Regions:
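Bacterial N-terminal signal peptides that target proteins for export
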Residues: 1-9
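C-terminal motif of bacterial Sec signal peptides marking the signal peptidase cleavage site
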Residues: 16-19
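An acidic, Gly/Ser/Thr/Pro-rich helix-cap/linker signature
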Residues: 23-145, 151-154
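Acidic helix-start/capping segments at beta-turn-to-alpha-helix junctions
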Residues: 90-115, 168-172, 181-189, 289-297
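Solvent-exposed loop/turn segments at secondary-structure junctions
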Residues: 100-103, 171-175, 234, 281, ...
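Acidic/His-rich structured neighborhood in mature extracellular/periplasmic domains
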Residues: 118-270
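Flexible, glycine-rich surface segments
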Residues: 223-224, 228-334
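C-terminal soluble interaction/assembly domains
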Residues: 293-382
């Protein structure tokens, strides 16, 4: 939900980027950092625990062997968080103290070394990972199994059943792959040891998510010591970040208890609510039935908002697709998006509605949102 537009979908990045080179903080390197030079030869050396062995959990205390509460920045973060959100300072610091540095998380987000060739982006390859027989077949079975829950969500929010199912299918293969990283560790690692010093905004974003996770724990909404998710801290069947859980998760039963990891009804309702809160319009398609000329590539602005209209597109040479009619979409904002094959120089252009851009708020990538739309179309058996 927070990735830049051109990042590959998070649920895929573990497989795709786990081999990224760059400055990787390994367990042994962190241990060395934690056991810096002794202040004086007269003082006894402090006995530190051994670094995690490969057979053990691949996480060690934040900042080498130093508990996070003993790192000035982290302690200040905890004190400020407790004060700003009226939380128990002691409980906040105790929870932070249990966070562990996860080198695998850092390796995944470490940028490639300078001079390394960039892998050309391919819409066909990306789409093929999600719009494929396994997800289509399991998606249709999912829609049958949860037909009542999907129907209730569609009636309440106006988001089609196949769109909700497609998002859950892309994110976690319909709940089967929710991630195995302890979210507390992932967010603490990314918030305070983000490997790219040129992106302080990313570190700040992850610290904000860590703050939301801690608040959710201390207010009884989830157990931050146990909850697992993606390497980036996304949680549950719909892969909500902690901030999205706070703002957009809803209970299907109307109770105060929301469980996105085990309760499919809550997950389905929350996905629909998220889309509506980010601009989903009942009755609009994701893409307008329009044929665009090649010259329409100049209308692509790379943004996440529809800034054009149908008269402008017609003036640029766009035409109705065969058999299509002008209806609500023709009176709504539109945008032209590109889906490139960089190696060959080819590009597919589509005319997106507000609903496409609502999906990009889930993951800020044209590839992601178009894959969701295409999978949804494949799931629609009407």
């Amino acid at each position: 939900m927070f990735a830049p537009r051109r990042l590959i979908l998070m649920s895929l990045t573990i497989a795709v980027l786990s081999g990224c080179s760059g400055t990787v903080v390994s367990p042994s390197q962190s241990a060395d950092a934690g056991s810096a030079k002794k202040a004086s030869p007269k003082k006894p050396e402090i006995k530190l625990p051994d670094a995690a062995k490969p057979s053990q959990a691949q996480s060690i205390p934040i900042g080498g062997h130093t508990p996070v509460s003993r790192r000035t920045a982290l302690k200040e973060f905890g004190v400020e968080l407790a004060a700003s959100r009226q939380l128990s300072e002691a409980r906040v610091l105790k929870l932070i103290d249990e966070a562990r540095y996860n080198p695998t998380v850092i390796r995944i987000v470490t940028p490639p070394a300078a001079g390394q060739p960039r892998v050309p982006r391919s819409w066909a390859n990306y789409r093929g990972r999600f719009v494929e027989p396994i997800r289509i077949n399991q998606g249709r079975a999912f829609m049958q199994q949860y037909a009542n829950e999907l129907d209730r969500a569609t009636k309440r929010y106006g988001v089609p059943q196949n769109i909700i199912a497609a998002i859950i299918g892309v994110e976690t293969l319909y709940g089967k792959s929710q991630g195995n990283f302890r979210v507390l560790d992932a967010l603490a690692s990314l918030g305070f040891d983000y490997p790219n010093p040129k992106r302080p905004d990313r570190a700040a974003m992850f610290r904000g998510q860590l703050a939301d996770l801690i608040e959710l724990d201390l207010t009884g909404k989830l157990d931050a010591r146990a909850i697992k998710g993606s390497y980036a801290g996304a949680i549950g069947i719909p892969q909500f970040m902690p901030g999205s859980i706070k703002r957009f998760a809803v209970s299907a039963s109307g109770s105060n208890s929301i469980d996105l990891s085990n309760n499919m009804s809550d997950a389905i309702m929350s996905v629909a609510n998220f889309l509506v809160e980010h601009g989903w319009q009942r009755g609009l398609p994701v893409f307008a039935p329009v044929t665009l000329p090649v010259s329409a590539d100049k209308l692509v602005d790379g943004g996440l908002k529809a800034n054009l209209d149908w008269p402008q597109l017609r003036a640029a040479g766009a035409k109705l697709a065969p058999g299509a009619k002008e209806n609500a979409w023709a009176r709504a904002p539109l945008g032209v998006i590109d889906l490139p094959e960089e190696a060959s120089g080819r590009v597919e252009l589509r005319t997106a509605t507000t609903n496409f851009f609502a999906i990009t708020q889930y993951n800020r990538s044209y590839f992601y949102a178009a894959s969701v739309a295409d999978l949804a179309q494949a799931l629609d058996t009407r």
